[in-house]
């Protein structure tokens, strides 16, 4: 039975919602009234483009205006991020946020902006596990054997990454610290050349997003030792979690959506609901699963909380590794 107090509280909440919606309608009679720019701060291709284009197409269909993907790569995502922060806070310029934003806050001491103050969280999109892959000729078949081999051969292992300061690089640094092993870090310009050299034996291993390596594992061209999330990946179900051996080890990549700070909360709320609805669509969910990713759900405040947690998590890893942008 609903009490009088509960009824009055619900009525007040409903009235406040109606008032906010009315104010939104007066100040923003038809958002969106023209095309919306969705900035991806990376070069075309890969999971970032697939996820962005999936969501932009669905938002275009649902909201009646075109959501256009604009790739603005450079400086580890900083160029695109800074461009969005400098844009008008009107909902017509959005940013595909990522792990790089959480890392750069502490990795780059000369960062020309404050991400936490410059971007309004809109919605989470997906989380992607990483996987430790090694050359097939390396005489190890598990995380425990890899650690034992590294300890028995200090400094002889080389581990690739997609670049200094990336989640792939820092996952390796965290692994080194937690496992008490040493190996040489070899940065590449992206995952593809690093994976190529792991397959050839030029380097012995690599932490990589499952999205770009699972097919090589399935084809038998690489050996997967463990995923970096606490749970196994649906796309590599036979690969255990690294945390099963190295208790407490956990990293991943994530993607979300942000807007310039001071974007009206009504617009943020609308976009959040539409993105969340899109992520619940069976077709989109399947496409995300096929990438090896996990859809993220929740309101804007929850995504903001996740960004805060991720930034703090990666700050600890950066401090532990001592790595800084030069």
Show which residues each predicted segment covers.
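Hinge/capping helix and adjacent helix->loop/strand transition within the periplasmic-binding protein
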Residues: 86-91, 106-193, 242, 254-287
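C-terminal lobe and pocket-closing loops
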Residues: 127, 212-280, 312
């Amino acid at each position: 039975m609903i009490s009088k107090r509960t009824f009055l509280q619900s009525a007040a909440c409903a009235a406040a919602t109606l008032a906010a919606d009315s104010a939104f309608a007066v100040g923003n009679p038809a958002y969106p009234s023209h095309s919306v720019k969705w900035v991806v701060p990376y070069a075309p291709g890969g999971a970032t483009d697939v996820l962005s284009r999936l969501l932009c197409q669905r938002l275009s269909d649902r909201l009646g205006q075109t959501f256009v993907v604009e790739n603005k790569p450079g400086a580890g995502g900083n160029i695109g991020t800074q461009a969005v922060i400098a844009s008008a806070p009107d909902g017509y310029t959005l940013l595909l946020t990522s792990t790089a934003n959480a890392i750069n806050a502490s990795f780059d001491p000369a960062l020309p902006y404050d991400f936490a103050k410059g971007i309004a969280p809109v919605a989470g999109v997906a989380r992607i596990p990483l996987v430790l892959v090694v050359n097939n000729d390396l005489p190890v078949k598990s995380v425990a054997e890899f650690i034992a081999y590294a300890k028995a051969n200090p400094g002889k292992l080389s581990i690739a990454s997609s670049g200094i300061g990336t989640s792939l690089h820092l996952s390796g640094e965290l692994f080194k610290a937690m496992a008490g092993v040493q190996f040489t870090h070899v940065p590449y310009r992206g995952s593809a050349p690093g994976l190529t050299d792991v397959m050839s034996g030029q380097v012995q291993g690599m932490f990589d997003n499952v999205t770009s390596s699972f097919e090589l594992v399935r084809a038998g061209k690489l050996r997967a030792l463990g995923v970096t999330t606490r749970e196994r990946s649906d796309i590599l179900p036979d690969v255990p979690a690294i945390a099963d051996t190295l208790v407490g080890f956990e990293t991943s990549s994530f993607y979300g959506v942000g807007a310039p700070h001071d974007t009206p909360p009504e617009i943020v709320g609308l976009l959040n609901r539409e993105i969340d609805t899109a992520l619940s669509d069976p077709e989109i969910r399947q496409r995300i699963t096929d990438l090896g990713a996990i859809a993220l759900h929740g309101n804007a405040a929850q995504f903001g909380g996740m960004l805060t947690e991720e930034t703090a998590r990666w700050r600890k890893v950066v401090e532990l590794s001592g790595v800084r942008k030069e």
